[in-house]
Swiss-Prot record:
Enzyme's top EC category: hydrolase
Chain residue ranges for the region called Disordered: 174-194
Function noted in UniProt: Catalyzes the deamination of dCTP to dUTP.
GO biological process, one term: nucleobase-containing small molecule interconversion
Cited CDD domains: trimeric_dUTPase
Name by which UniProt lists this protein: dCTP deaminase
Gene responsible for this protein: dcd
Binding locations of dCTP: R110, S111, S112, L113, A114, R115, D128, V136, L137, E138, Y171, K178, Q182
Domain of life: Bacteria
Pathway participation: Pyrimidine metabolism; dUMP biosynthesis; dUMP from dCTP (dUTP route): step 1/2
The organism's taxonomic lineage, starting at the top: Bacteria, Pseudomonadati, Pseudomonadota, Gammaproteobacteria, Alteromonadales
Length: 194
């Protein structure tokens, strides 16, 4: 069942869910906790690659990904990152989140931002039980105007569901976890898929 604001506060108080820095009471509403935008981004560089073969040999795929993905971009707190129409960028939340093995989290974008064309996650909005780290945001601007995104702005909301039991393989204990303890906007690691 989805956790209510009262249950979320209890989980934060007893350390079942850890959000660092801990959100203020004003960030917790009926069934969610607001999260803010961090200061790290990654974008797709201009490139001449005609495509990326997502089922090709891992080494070739990694070379193509390295060629098109930028290094980490750090934005100062008083500056903005501009996301232009049709662009995809990666970023991270300001907050780091730790979930136990019996709670799954979900990231939702804000309706007010979606009405301007901003998608906060392209498809990956589940936060696995056992997750520990910052949440990567997959921004896409489907609107007509560039959007200025500033570190610290409220960018989305997390909600949580308690599972019927703890999972047998929490995210942070699996050897195959590609984004374990993530603290920055990590590029796709699809080439590590088995």
């Amino acid at each position: 069942m989805r956790l209510t604001d009262i249950e979320i506060e209890q989980c934060l108080d007893n350390g079942t869910i850890i959000i660092d820095p801990r959100p203020g009471i004003e960030a917790i509403s009926g069934v969610s906790v607001d999260v803010r935008l961090g200061s790290q981004f990654r974008v797709f560089k201009d490139h001449t690659a005609p495509y990326i073969d997502l089922s090709g040999p891992s080494a070739e795929m990694q070379i193509a990904l390295d060629r098109i993905m930028s290094d980490k971009i750090e934005i100062a707190d008083d500056q903005a990152f501009f996301l232009h129409p049709g662009e995809l960028a990666l970023a991270v939340t300001y907050e780091s989140v730790t979930l136990p093995a019996d709670i799954v989290g979900w990231l939702d974008g804000r309706s007010s931002l979606a009405r301007l064309g901003l998608m906060v996650h392209v498809t990956a909005h589940r936060i696995d039980p056992g997750w520990q780290g910052k949440i990567v945001l997959e921004f896409f601007n489907s609107g007509k105007l560039p959007l200025a995104l500033r570190p610290g702005m409220t960018i989305g909301a997390l909600n949580f569901e308690r599972l019927s039991s703890a999972v047998a393989r929490p995210y942070n204990t699996r050897k195959s976890s590609k984004y374990k303890d993530q603290q920055e906007a990590v590029a796709s690691r699809i080439s590590q898929d088995k």
